[in-house]
Amino acid sequence: MDEQQWTGQLDLTVFFDGNRSVSRDIFFEKALKVIRPVYLNQSTIPTFYIVNVGGGYLDGDRYRMNVNVEDNAKVTLTSQGATKIYKTPSNHVEQYQTFNLKDNAYLEYVADPIIAYENAKFYQHNTFNLNNSSSLFYTDILTPGYSKTGEAFKYQYMHLINEIYIEDELVTYDNLLLNPNKQSINEIGYMEHYSHYGSAYFIHEDVNQKLIDSVYETISSYSNTFDCRVAISQLPTHGFAVRIFAYRTQIIEKILGTIQSYIAENIYDRKLDFLRKY
């Protein structure tokens, strides 16, 4: 796509300088920007806050983001607030995100919810390029926004594609389409009467069935405490995926945060940094 047609774009490279991970080659323009990194609690891992300066995604908006994590570097990415998709009467919103992870690199991307309002149309395509030794933790939360009638699922559609490659081989292709006009979203086989959806991927060379079982034991009790459903499955590589149905964003955030904390403590031997957004 011609650069003139992007509503916002962002390029970021993170490398390891021998002591900590640092950024270079930062470029952003128009409606996307990234705040100068912070090292929370004296961590050696930078945290970047990605901001949409326009306050929301509008009819026909196009966004592009490219993140490179070099050898031995680690980075945490998050958003400063929810991604709000407003009504798109003429043309849908598109977002393309590419993440390139080199040897022993680790990317942790925990964004705020994507909120689709009445008559919104949203398409997101993520591509993750990993090496055998690189690692990834990525989450998404989908939330129905306000409608005049008070009904959920008044958006036109939400279409999210995630492609994960390891050593240039496609190992996961996740194609999620929620289209209330053509699907009975509330029914069994879709959202099963729940209104909010959360997902996570974790890829690391130490992932095996024993670790997956341990993660599930850590989060399974939430189904007894809250009205939600949680499932975990092994990917066709050294990784797993988590799916969550709930009625509230906060429940999904709590479950995803528990998984993220488990990974930080059991895989990386560190405490999870509080992102301090508010």
Swiss-Prot record:
Q: This protein's superkingdom? A: Bacteria
Keywords per UniProt: Chaperone, Cytoplasm, Nickel insertion
Q: Which residues cross the membrane?
A: none
* GO function term, MF aspect, one: nickel cation binding
Q: Which Pfam families does the protein's record reference?
A: UreD
Query: InterPro entries in the record, alphabetically?
Result: UreD
Taken from the UniProt entry, a GO cellular component term is: cytoplasm
Query: What disulfide bonds does the UniProt entry report for this chain?
Result: none
Q: Where in the cell is it found?
A: Cytoplasm
User: What biological function has been recorded for the protein in this entry?
Assistant: Required for maturation of urease via the functional incorporation of the urease nickel metallocenter.
Q: How does it assemble?
A: UreD, UreF and UreG form a complex that acts as a GTP-hydrolysis-dependent molecular chaperone, activating the urease apoprotein by helping to assemble the nickel containing metallocenter of UreC. The UreE protein probably delivers the nickel.
The record's annotation in HAMAP family points to: UreD
Q: Which family does it belong to?
A: Belongs to the UreD family.
Protein name according to UniProt: Urease accessory protein UreD
Q: What's the source species for this entry?
A: Staphylococcus aureus (strain NCTC 8325 / PS 47)
Gene name per UniProt: ureD
